[in-house]
Amino acid sequence: MNLNSIPAFDDNYIWVLNDEAGRCLIVDPGDAEPVLNAIAANNWQPEAIFLTHHHHDHVGGVKELVEKFPQIVVYGPQETQDKGTTQVVKDGETAFVLGHEFSVIATPGHTLGHICYFSKPYLFCGDTLFSGGCGRLFEGTASQMYQSINKLSALPDDTLVCCAHEYTLSNMKFALSILPHDLSINDYYRKVKELRAKNQITLPVILKNERQINVFLRTEDIDLINVINEETLLQQPEERFAWLRSKKDRF
């Protein structure tokens, strides 16, 4: 299968997987127009849509796409049932698309019903995990988000993390503010800065590398613990995650 990214709005990415026959899967189409343009340019035949959560910048294009291609099956969590979903899926279930099984993973935090889809090596994680960061807590708790991103972090090393936003540069600036002397973070920041200066995408990222540079995935790292302990003594990784999320919200 071929992985394609379609820019939308200011910083969204709509992901499309296509097979050799031209059948395709569309993930979180917040806007129909760029998707329709890509379909026409590549002669794709849409088979399915995956929705991760109910926010408009992820579901806004569904209605128009379904009107154009009525055969499309729209998979999504319960919270997207009024956004065009025709097949509600939940944690532990699978969606069979393009000849592949995609596992559904519940990841509450950004929204309460947020889900992700995984079929090795592809992880479509919506607004749960970003390169260098994680989603804001609009509905869920820090505890829920901590558990959610750790579920994703446990996936295979070679997983391709397909995030829904180009937030990498700002996330790495935050990471540097927390761990300014970390070599992995500094190296990745320079790489990301160069890519964005050329208006190039920083995604997808390999999960093995992401674990090294994402401070939200390093809550048991001694360097991070020492930094946090300078301000407050927190015994549990979950508490350290909440501290980081609060810092990022104010960054």
Swiss-Prot record:
Coiled-coil regions listed: none
EC number: 3.1.2.6
Binding, Zn(2+) 2: D57, H58, D127, H165
Cofactor(s) this protein requires: Zn(2+)
GO molecular function: hydroxyacylglutathione hydrolase activity; metal ion binding
Top EC group: hydrolase
Residues noted as binding Zn(2+) 1 in the record, renumbered to the chain: H53, H55, H110, D127
Catalytic reactions of this protein: an S-(2-hydroxyacyl)glutathione + H2O = a 2-hydroxy carboxylate + glutathione + H(+)
UniProt KW keywords: Hydrolase, Metal-binding, Zinc
Known pathway: Secondary metabolite metabolism; methylglyoxal degradation; (R)-lactate from methylglyoxal: step 2/2
Free-text cofactor note: Binds 2 Zn(2+) ions per subunit.
GO terms under biological process: methylglyoxal catabolic process to D-lactate via S-lactoyl-glutathione
Family named by the database record: Belongs to the metallo-beta-lactamase superfamily. Glyoxalase II family.
Subunit-level organization: Monomer.
Function (record text): Thiolesterase that catalyzes the hydrolysis of S-D-lactoyl-glutathione to form glutathione and D-lactic acid.
PANTHER family associated with the record: HYDROXYACYLGLUTATHIONE HYDROLASE (PTHR43705), HYDROXYACYLGLUTATHIONE HYDROLASE GLOB (PTHR43705:SF1)
Protein name in UniProt: Hydroxyacylglutathione hydrolase
Gene source species: Escherichia coli (strain SE11)
Name of encoding gene: gloB
